[in-house]
UniProtKB/Swiss-Prot annotation:
The lineage of its organism: Eukaryota, Metazoa, Chordata, Craniata, Vertebrata. This is Thrombin-like enzyme TLBan. One of its GO terms (cellular component) is secretory granule. Expressed by the venom gland. Thrombin-like snake venom serine protease, with high clotting activity in vitro. Also has fibrinogenolytic ability, showing a fast degradation of fibrinogen Aalpha chain (FGA), a slow degradation of Bbeta chain (FGB) and no degradation of gamma chain. Also causes platelet aggregation in platelet rich plasma (PRP) and washed platelet suspension.
Amino acid sequence: VIGGDECNINEHPFLVALYYSTFFCGMTLINQEWVLTAAHESEKFPKEKYFIFCPNNKDIMLIRLDKPVSNSEHIAPLSLPSSPPSVGSVCRKPALYTKVFDYLLWIQSIIAGNTATCP
């Protein structure tokens, strides 16, 4: 992050850095098999590796990992919200903004192996 502060290695165990020859993009681990990132990164991925949520320029994408990761001191998924953040509250979760809650049912459906349509 440009202008950001250095953090402890255990401080954000849900952050994922994707390297494709060089640093490619940041993501959020949401369970042992899935990461959440911005859909505008999709043009750089093999098509079978990701799902783009909505054709209406929704900038959200899920990527299924080749194999599940194991939780450890340095690796743990971010807990997805069970209710939307209140207006004006600070989420304090990198890459998890208020709008992500709008897509929570879609995210849960894809992870469960089902399909869902745009809200």
